Amino acid sequence: MAAMNTTNHHQGWRMPVPAHSGIYKLHLQAKESLGTAEVRDSVRLPRGIDRNEWIASNMVTLFEELVYMVSAITDVCSESTCPKMCAGKHTSYSWADEKQPAPRATSAPDYMRTLVMYTEDFLSDQTLVPGDGSPFPPAFLPMVKKLCKRFFRVYAHAYIHHFDNFQHFGAEAHLNCNFKHFLYFVLEFDLVGKQDMSPLAELIKMFLETDDRNRTKGKAKSEK
């Protein structure tokens, strides 16, 4: 089995928002809270924070996590092993954007590389993601929804076609943690439709039910 690239996963990647911006500071706050609070609670909009700014800051965090995952499977997800971007036998994905509006078939690695660059361009575009406190444009949220739908496709491909690779190298816990963060975020802000997430419906159901049971147990213990 080919090795997974679990080191240097930020090589060639740049932080798309300025380090001095409010969005970047919120990104650090959101990232820190992931280690100190339940994931479902950590994505909720804090009191007094602009909704779009909070969404933008979390998108930076989700993007970091996506880059890690894409980099981790670079050596096992290739043009030869994954010539088609898909999530199982019956779900395949094409790529389209403003420059090439006609959907085109693509390999999984090409889709993921294109998505990383596309997201990087979006997050660094000050007209779409203002870092100076200016109002967010109407195009911001539709673009976030488009990106989140595509982020999900990468997770679906990773789980369905490469989960054994993550297990083999002991990285499945990291994958699960990142996906749960993504899942609770898109559910909290209604960013990805249920039908779009159907390839991982059973996994999502398991995560939600397990989390509900754990929260119920925790609440019962605290009341004793």
Task: Show where each model-derived region lies.
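Short amphipathic alpha-helical segments embedded in low-complexity Lys/Glu-rich regions
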Residues: D132-L141, D164-N176, S198-L203
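Helix N-terminus capping/helix-initiation residues
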Residues: D50, T106-S107, G193
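Charged/polar positions within long, soluble alpha-helices
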Residues: S124-T127, A156-D164, Y184-K194
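Amphipathic alpha-helical interface segments within eukaryotic helical scaffold
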Residues: V67-M143, C148-F152, A156-Y159
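Eukaryote-biased recognition of C-terminal alpha-helical segments
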Residues: A171-K224
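The feature captures two recurrent sequence modes
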Residues: M1-P101
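Extracellular/luminal segments of secreted precursors and ectodomains of membrane proteins
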Residues: R150, N165, N178-F182
